[in-house]
C-alpha cells in the first residue's frame, strides 16, 4: 500500500458479532484527504466488505463528499448513499436489511475515524516540531 498523502487519514471498521476470528458481518474502510485549508474534502475512498460477493467501492458516496466542507451531516449522507450499492444476503449473522443499515453506520464511523486520525497526526507533527524547535544546543563551558 502506498504511503498516505499529507492531510490524509484512513480507518477500517468491522462488526464481529461473535469472536475476533469470525467473518465480519459488515466492514467499511475509508481514506480521507483534506485540502490545504483542512476545511474541505479533497479526495475520499470508501470500500465495503461482507455486503456483496466481492468488496465494493462506494463511488457515488465518494463523489458526494469530494469538495464538500467537513460536516457530520456529509458523513451521514455518504453512509446513506453507500447503502445503495450494498447487496448483502441474509444469513445467521443477520438479515440483508440489517446489514444494509449497518453499512450506513459503519461508513459514517469510518469517515469520522479517518478524520480523527488526520487530526491526531497533525497534533503529533505539531508537537514534534515544537519539541525540536525548543531544543537548543548545549554550549560547552571553558575548562579551568
Which residues does each PLM region occupy?
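C-terminal structural segment of proteins
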Residues: 1-144
Amino acid at each position: 500500500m502506498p504511503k498516505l498523502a499529507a492531510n490524509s487519514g484512513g480507518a477500517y471498521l468491522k462488526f464481529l458479532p461473535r469472536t475476533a476470528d469470525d467473518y465480519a458481518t459488515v466492514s467499511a474502510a475509508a481514506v480521507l484527504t483534506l485540502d490545504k485549508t483542512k476545511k474541505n474534502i479533497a479526495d475520499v475512498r470508501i470500500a465495503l466488505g461482507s455486503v456483496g460477493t466481492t468488496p465494493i467501492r462506494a463511488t457515488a458516496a465518494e463523489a458526494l463528499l469530494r469538495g464538500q466542507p467537513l460536516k457530520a451531516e456529509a458523513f451521514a449522507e455518504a453512509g446513506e448513499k453507500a447503502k445503495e450499492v450494498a447487496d448483502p444476503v441474509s444469513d445467521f449473522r443477520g438479515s440483508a436489511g440489517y446489514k444494509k443499515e449497518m453499512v450506513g453506520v459503519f461508513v459514517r464511523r469510518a469517515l469520522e475515524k479517518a478524520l480523527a486520525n488526520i487530526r491526531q497526526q497533525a497534533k503529533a507533527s505539531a508537537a514534534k516540531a515544537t519539541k525540536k524547535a525548543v531544543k537548543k544546543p548545549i554550549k560547552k563551558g571553558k575548562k579551568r
